């Protein structure tokens, strides 16, 4: 409805209708043109016609609703999820103030928890927030904004010393996690402009390899926000933008403003190009390391790691690989497994933190090489040399089974980080699982109960102490 909103995130026009249909009660109050109007609904049915209930200088709409617990199995709101989204919106719409009040959390004085979200710097502050734990290569984010054309474009970007790319894109405040034409336009302009500057400066003359788009984006954190009157999304979930005209708009804005920045800031420009050169050299070394891992697998026959206790089943859909901590856990896991379907791969100590390592170092790490070899995956498809190839995946379930302590949690995080950065297709394909080890074994005689929480432990003790003698119940903590 262009008469109501210049741009909107709505796609089908059913947002409030769906909320109404899924609520036991809903009340909508509209403040407009000095008047206040209201309507209430129960189970989606209006209780009365829209009525005027007073006058006010306020502008906006207030929606109050209660989820229908006959439809939802759980209607508990996660504070962190809501807070993260409101923080995001405050960065995307600089200057606005958003208040989040949680009446479930009350302090000693009986006051509920209140958090205010406000950003004067907008996307600049957003990038600083995203990179707060990383070491910056240049002091302040590059900022680009243009609303001259039909598509307003806003971009902030910053280079850091990490080896990964973090690009977040938004269309009308919607997070397009799969990217789309606005991201394609940004990448095209970034690669073209930086390469042109690097060529003119002569810094690439001694480099004996071709520089690719990936090299220009290593260590980059960027936020792209566009406003589009008629957004066209691929699929129902609004995760990928399809408007072809957005690519050109973003390309032009980023190209012009980045070129100006590089010309006016030669010191920072040199630092960025040096980072690109290092990325190209590391990429070449990583390609050789990947090829070496895959060549060794071919030359050594099956090439399976020596510590892998494989399963006898040959159908990958029925096979499961358990990644466990060390040889001792591997021994216990082997005793409890079903040899037909369960394979066990013990990992020695903590694997490499791939977030802080150059790519070629990753493929030289023994534990990571063992995981790649055991899984049977390779790198390189028609989409690119770094894309994970799952055609020979040996297990359709990969279970990370670490201890229930801090070390176990750390090892699990390191493995998940490696999968997320270099084997994302495993996660997206639903192949990665996390085992939930119990914290306690509650035992009396031959009766045993495993417990995952304190509440379960207390309930198990009461259940097993039938005669009231809790001291006769043994508790083993893992």
Swiss-Prot record:
Identification of the protein by name: DNA gyrase subunit B
Organism: Cytophaga hutchinsonii
Domain of life: Bacteria
Compartment(s): Cytoplasm
GO biological process: DNA topological change
MF GO annotations: ATP binding; DNA binding; DNA topoisomerase type II (double strand cut, ATP-hydrolyzing) activity; metal ion binding
Transmembrane residue ranges: none
UniProt KW keywords: ATP-binding, Cytoplasm, DNA-binding, Isomerase, Magnesium, Metal-binding, Nucleotide-binding, Topoisomerase
Major site of localization recorded for this protein: cytoplasm
EC number(s) given by UniProt: 5.6.2.2
Record's GO cellular component terms: cytoplasm
Cofactor(s) annotated in UniProt: Mg(2+); Mn(2+); Ca(2+)
Cofactor note: Binds two Mg(2+) per subunit. The magnesium ions form salt bridges with both the protein and the DNA. Can also accept other divalent metal cations, such as Mn(2+) or Ca(2+).
Binding residues for Mg(2+) 1: 325, 403
Main EC class the enzyme belongs to: isomerase
Similarity remark: Belongs to the type II topoisomerase GyrB family.
Cytoplasm recorded as keyword: yes
Toprim domain location: 319-438
Binding partners and assembly: Heterotetramer, composed of two GyrA and two GyrB chains. In the heterotetramer, GyrA contains the active site tyrosine that forms a transient covalent intermediate with DNA, while GyrB binds cofactors and catalyzes ATP hydrolysis.
Catalysed transformations (reactions): ATP-dependent breakage, passage and rejoining of double-stranded DNA
Positions contributing to Mg(2+) 2 binding: 403, 405
Annotated site, Interaction with DNA, chain positions: 350, 353
Record's function text: A type II topoisomerase that negatively supercoils closed circular double-stranded (ds) DNA in an ATP-dependent manner to modulate DNA topology and maintain chromosomes in an underwound state. Negative supercoiling favors strand separation, and DNA replication, transcription, recombination and repair, all of which involve strand separation. Also able to catalyze the interconversion of other topological isomers of dsDNA rings, including catenanes and knotted rings. Type II topoisomerases break and join 2 DNA strands simultaneously in an ATP-dependent manner.
């Amino acid at each position: 409805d262009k008469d109501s909103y210049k741009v909107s995130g709505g796609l089908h026009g059913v947002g409030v209708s769906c909320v109404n249909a899924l609520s036991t009660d809903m009340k909508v109050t509209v403040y407009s043109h000095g008047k206040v109007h209201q309507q209430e609904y129960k189970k989606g049915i209006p209780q009365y016609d829209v009525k005027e209930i007073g006058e006010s200088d306020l502008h906006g709409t207030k929606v109050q609703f209660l989820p229908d617990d006959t439809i939802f199995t759980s209607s508990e709101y996660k504070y962190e999820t809501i807070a993260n989204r409101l923080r995001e919106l405050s960065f995307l719409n600089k200057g606005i103030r958003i208040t989040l009040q949680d009446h479930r959390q009350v302090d000693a004085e009986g006051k509920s928890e209140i958090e205010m979200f406000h950003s004067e710097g907008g996307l600049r502050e957003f990038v600083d927030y995203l990179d707060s734990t990383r070491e910056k290569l240049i002091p302040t984010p590059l900022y680009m904004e243009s609303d001259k054309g039909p598509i307003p474009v806003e971009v902030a970007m910053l280079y850091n010393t990490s080896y990964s790319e973090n690009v977040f894109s938004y269309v009308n405040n919607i997070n397009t996690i799969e990217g789309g034409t606005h991201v394609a336009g940004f990448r095209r302009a970034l690669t073209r402009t930086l390469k042109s500057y690097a060529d003119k400066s002569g810094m690439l003359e001694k480099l004996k390899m071709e520089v690719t788009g990936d090299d220009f984006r290593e260590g980059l954190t960027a936020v792209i926000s566009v406003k589009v009157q008629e957004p066209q999304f691929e699929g129902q979930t609004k995760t990928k933008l399809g408007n072809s005209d957005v690519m050109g708009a973003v390309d032009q804005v980023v190209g012009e403003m980045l070129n100006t920045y590089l010309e006016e800031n030669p010191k920072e420009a040199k630092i960025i190009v040096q980072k690109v050169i290092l990325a190209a050299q590391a990429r070449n070394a990583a390609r050789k390391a990947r090829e070496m891992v895959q060549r060794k697998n071919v030359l050594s026959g099956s090439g399976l790691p020596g510590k892998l206790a494989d399963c006898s089943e040959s159908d990958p859909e029925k096979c499961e690989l358990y990644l466990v901590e060390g040889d001792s856990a591997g021994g216990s896991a082997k005793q409890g497994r079903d040899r037909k379907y369960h394979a066990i791969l013990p990992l020695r100590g903590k694997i490499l933190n791939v977030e802080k390592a150059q790519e070629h170092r990753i493929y030289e790490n023994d534990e990571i090489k063992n995981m790649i070899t055991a899984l049977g995956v390779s790198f390189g498809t028609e989409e690119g040399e770094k894309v994970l190839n799952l055609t020979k995946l040996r297990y359709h379930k990969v279970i990370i089974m670490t201890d229930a302590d801090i070390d176990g949690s750390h090892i699990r995080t390191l493995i998940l980080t490696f999968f997320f950065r270099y084997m994302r297709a495993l996660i997206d394909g639903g192949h990665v699982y996390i085992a939930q080890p119990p914290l306690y074994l509650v035992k009396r005689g031959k009766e045993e109960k495993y417990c995952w929480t304190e509440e379960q432990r207390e309930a198990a003790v009461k259940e097993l102490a039938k005669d009231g003698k809790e001291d006769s119940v043994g508790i083993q903590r893992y």
